A protein has these predicted regions:
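Boundary/linker segments flanking structured domains
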Residues: 1-37, 45-49, 60-259
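Active-site ExK catalytic segment of metal-dependent nucleases
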Residues: 53-57
Length: 259
């Protein structure tokens, strides 16, 4: 259940700080924030150009692999990232995240859910939905193919397309999602883009709460095709905590995204 694009850019020496912030927002071991399974994008901070679109069952762990913090896995972009940093100070990084209801089973949460499954006398597979993992494969295929159709080639660091199922589901406006990954200055005209960076949300639980609230409206926009204002009105009807009013009073809806 995708909905929110969260943008940031980091220096080479800030990679571990970024990884910790991603893990804070998208941990597989808790049920708040967002699911650990999602789409990510590396982009040229200076040219505002997509370099790579990928998927991960565990976004924080995959980021660490790409940046050489964890042992290299197949498909790691560590060499490309090192080459980029040899010529540039900052690298753009964006995550396209899902609701925690889409959290799949990954190695970091397996022990927790094995314990729950044993207590419930149920197969561990029954404890979590695999829909989240299936969705990221499909969405990755859609986004890479939409880029290829628009520009005539894959992103620079992508050597192939994604899911064949995803490739057959591309719609003309899907390229707008791809462009949102690397164009932070256009945040105000794109309602799926967070007004705070990955690290800002990690440092500010209230802002994270606001973006989690808006995620529900974004899901309705992307999944049901509702207009954003209509989706927002719909979720506000059930806002028993007064989250949206608090958001308005705090000035968060006027906050500028600075990456």
């Amino acid at each position: 259940m995708f909905g929110t694009v969260i943008i940031d850019a980091y220096r080479k020496e800030e990679a571990l700080e970024m990884a910790d912030a991603i893990d804070d927002l998208c941990s597989p071991t808790d049920n708040y924030g967002w699911a650990s399974a999602g789409i990510y994008c590396f982009w040229d901070y200076y040219a505002e150009a997509v370099l790579y679109i990928g998927l991960a069952g565990d976004l924080a762990e995959r980021f660490k692999q790409h940046n050489g913090i964890l042992p290299i896995k197949e498909g790691s972009k560590q060499k490309q990232i090192e080459d980029y940093f040899s010529r540039n100070e900052r690298l753009g990084y964006t995550i396209f995240v899902q609701s925690p209801l889409s959290q799949p089973l990954v190695h970091r949460n397996r022990k927790v859910y094995e314990k729950f499954a044993k207590q419930q006398n149920s197969p561990i597979e029954d404890m979590l939905s695999e829909q989240g993992r299936d969705d990221i494969k499909r969405v990755e295929g859609i986004l890479i193919e939409s880029f290829r159709r628009k520009y005539g080639h894959f992103p620079l660091w992508n050597s192939m397309g994604g899911s064949m199922v995803g490739q057959t589901k591309v719609m003309e406006n899907n390229i707008n999602i791809v462009n949102s990954f690397c164009q932070p200055d256009n945040y105000a005209i794109n309602p799926i883009v967070s007004r705070s960076t990955i690290r800002e949300l990690s440092r500010n639980p209230e802002w994270e709460w606001y973006e989690n609230y808006l995620h529900a409206a974004r899901m309705k926009l992307l999944i049901l095709g509702m207009e954003y204002d209509e989706a927002l009105e719909f979720i506000n009807k059930n806002d028993t905590l007064g989250t949206y009013e608090r958001m308005k009073k705090s000035g968060y809806l006027r906050k500028r995204l600075i990456v």
